[in-house]
Amino acid sequence: MPRIHVLPPGLVNQIAAGEVVERPASIVKELVENALDAGATSVGVDVEEGGLALVRVADDGSGMDRDDALLALERHATSKLRDAEGLAAIGTMGFRGEAVPAIASVSRFRLDTSAGEDGAGTRVEIEGGVLGEVAPVARPRGTTVEVRDLFFNTPARRKFMRAASTEAGHVSEAVIRLALARPDVGFTLRSAGRLVLGARAGGGLADRAGQALGREAHRHLLPVDARRGEVRVHGLICSPDHSEATGRALYLFVNGRYVRDRAAAHAVLRAFAGTLPPGRHPAGVLFVELPLHRVDVNVHPQKLEVRFAEGREVFDALFHTVAGALRTAPWLRARPQPGDGVPAGNGGGPAPVPVAGEEAAEVLAWARAARPPEGSGATLVQPAPGAWATGRLAFPVAPAPGAGPEAGPRPEGYFAALRYVGQHARTYLLCEAPGGTLVVIDQHASHERMLFHRLREAFRARRIPVQPFLLPQVVTLPPAAARALEAGLAELGRLGFDAEPFGGEAFAVKGAPAALAGVDLTALLTDLGSQLAEVERGSAVDDAFHDLLATMACHAAVRANQDVSPEEARALLDGLDAIDFKARCPHGRPVVFELSLADLERRVGRR
């Protein structure tokens, strides 16, 4: 049996390099983080052949004297940590003292550094972990590290590297993440002598985000900033008018450190629920700040993952901060508010959208309370007189006798300022905006969004207005949907349905949400049963309620190829200004299309 023995230091460093040095981008990350920890105000990165031939990182930080320069090459030697208490509340980017010796063990490594203002510095050279020349060198205060011929002594590692262009892309992404975290520091990145990134110090987060996300995304950035308990979330998020095919354009930072956290990313995606088409993802730059002792950064070799003491608190802070910003921000792109005379976002400050609670109160005011079904959070009501329209559009119309569609005061807002022209193809509402812009509104998508908003807010208040039936309505469902619905009767009650099994695949429905008057209950309950079958019991069901409510709103909304009176159209337009996320239906489809007068005139040859 082989005897146990202690590995030589060089081999230990190469093993450590297997965790720390995944690719050239890992080296860039570690060296730039060291520069930032040293107080650098300017960092320059140069790479050749994607970093395989050369990685050079130069900074103007505090630098090191000769003794510290040599000590920095020893494993577990660091200036950033002294005891266990410090590890529990680490605030620097690096702290383990592993990266530099690990990098030096798999490359031809040179370190030039100076800690004084006299121009005297130190040069240390290492080849494959073996110390070479240590000599004085003239240089200004700061540090320059050159890493050449990465993995020259570990060919098995080098053969797993991708093409130089691929590795250069990873290096660029690493520098972008670091530049986003520190807008106060200047960054340059050159690849094969070509300037890839130039970010001046103090330009602001919006400029950095524009460089990272692109010019189109920059036009849609919204500021977010809120605190919940000890957690603050701030940064910039793109409105739903701009989305990405993957989640890579969402940059999340915890106490200044870029992290990959699936729960945090999911919280942001949840905040966008119903505003993005399926398969699309939000983009933005978000910072989470919380006390250092409440987050453990020592759980991943490259510190890309963290562990929170209270993960739910961080999830809630992200969700509510982003959702609140989307709810109140004027993200109907370049759409003027009445009385402003300027596009939203260009000054003048459009009126804020009413908060969710106000809308919920309006919904609940439509109905008078009665006996709640046993075991549910819903409230049985009779619809208030005039509360519902003709059975097609479930929102208040009730104009004064003889009043036309333009009569009476209306709420201020984008939709209220539109002049209703008429209905096209019994599907689209045609309107004229101030300035002559043609506005086309999808009647189903817009009504669906309004119904969804009201159902959701009433659901959150646990008081969905419910219409009891004089006689139970018996519906028969497909077997799979019936089984799922029977298992999910409690969830069905929370949605405002009073139903019970009636033998086989049949259910006796004694009441349903008042907003769904006239809906085909068989079709609706079949869809709800199918959705319930796809989720597990417990917390996952809460995540699914958005989709369930969206399905209910879709079934109840006015359809395409259905007549809408001018009064109903006017009431719909006025009502849209009082809800959030009005630019898209709950499934993410656009509600509004605009054609400016200038574009129209160009189309017909007037310009």
From Swiss-Prot:
DNA repair as UniProt keyword: yes
SUPFAM superfamilies: ATPase domain of HSP90 chaperone/DNA topoisomerase II/histidine kinase (SSF55874), DNA mismatch repair protein MutL (SSF118116), Ribosomal protein S5 domain 2-like (SSF54211)
GO biological process: mismatch repair
An example Gene Ontology CC term for this record: mismatch repair complex
Gene Ontology MF terms in the entry: ATP binding; ATP hydrolysis activity; ATP-dependent DNA damage sensor activity; mismatched DNA binding
Assigned keywords, A-Z: DNA damage, DNA repair
InterPro entries registered for this protein in UniProt: DNA_mismatch_repair_MutL (IPR020667), DNA_mismatch_S5_2-like (IPR013507), HATPase_C_sf (IPR036890), MutL/Mlh/PMS (IPR002099), MutL/Mlh/Pms-like (IPR038973), MutL_C (IPR014790), MutL_C_dimsub (IPR042120), MutL_C_regsub (IPR042121)
Protein family according to the UniProt entry: Belongs to the DNA mismatch repair MutL/HexB family.
Protein function: This protein is involved in the repair of mismatches in DNA. It is required for dam-dependent methyl-directed DNA mismatch repair. May act as a 'molecular matchmaker', a protein that promotes the formation of a stable complex between two or more DNA-binding proteins in an ATP-dependent manner without itself being part of a final effector complex.
Record-linked HAMAP family: DNA_mis_repair
Protein name: DNA mismatch repair protein MutL
